[in-house]
Amino acid sequence: MGVLGGDAHVPIGSQVSPGSVVVTNNESFGHRKLLKGVDFLVRIKAFAFCLAVIVLLKNNVQTTVIAPGIVLQAKYNNTKAPVSLLVLASICCGYAFLQAVVSLLSFIRDKRVLNNTVLAWLTFLLDQVLTYLLLGSAAATAEAAYIAKRGEDKVQWKAVCGPFKRFCDHFAATVFLSFIAVIAFAVSAAISAYYLFRRSKGFK
């Protein structure tokens, strides 16, 4: 015979110390649903920010006439850093979308889709690798944007944002969104690490 407390049965003879908390099945279910919901939202945001970076970079072109007969054009591929960022953002965008779909299915079914230790490790490693690669690429692009705006006296590189203000403004927005995408990927990596830790403890 026992006393029913929520979904948990506590024997009458058992002692529960003051301040102790009994975790019920409903609480565990709610925690899982919340975590899966957060995982989906973070991954879909990572997808959206990476997509915004791609669109901004591809469409960031400005042509300026600096003198009669002299026309200059600024494009994202004038330097290597934005090109690398575009390639990496495209990879991250596709990966984030696939993971968002998997996360949404897990949320709907209330169980992990592709529930496998090898895949859990693969997700964890890919989250980590892509986060650091995206961070490095965003930092390199930020440096290129800074030099374009301020110049570099030591190597006699002149600032170019004077005649290309719109281009530089869009470039700055791209860098900002890139770092927001990095934050979203970092949170996703933390969640996948938590899932891997739970699996190592015998939880699904």
Swiss-Prot record:
Cytoplasmic topology ranges: 1-36, 106-117, 192-204
Superkingdom of the source species: Eukaryota
Keyword Transmembrane among record annotations: yes
Subcellular location: Cell membrane
Extracellular side: 58-84, 139-170
Keywords, ordered alphabetically: Cell membrane, Glycoprotein, Membrane, Transmembrane, Transmembrane helix
Residue stretches spanning the membrane: 37-57, 85-105, 118-138, 171-191
InterPro entries associated with the record: CASP/CASPL, CASP_dom
Keyword Glycosyltransferase included in the entry's annotation: no
Membrane topology note: Multi-pass membrane protein
Main location: membrane
Residue positions the entry lists as glycosylated: 77
UniProt GO cellular component terms: plasma membrane
Homology family: Belongs to the Casparian strip membrane proteins (CASP) family.
Subunit structure: Homodimer and heterodimers.
Protein name listed in UniProt: CASP-like protein 2U1
Native species: Selaginella moellendorffii (Spikemoss)
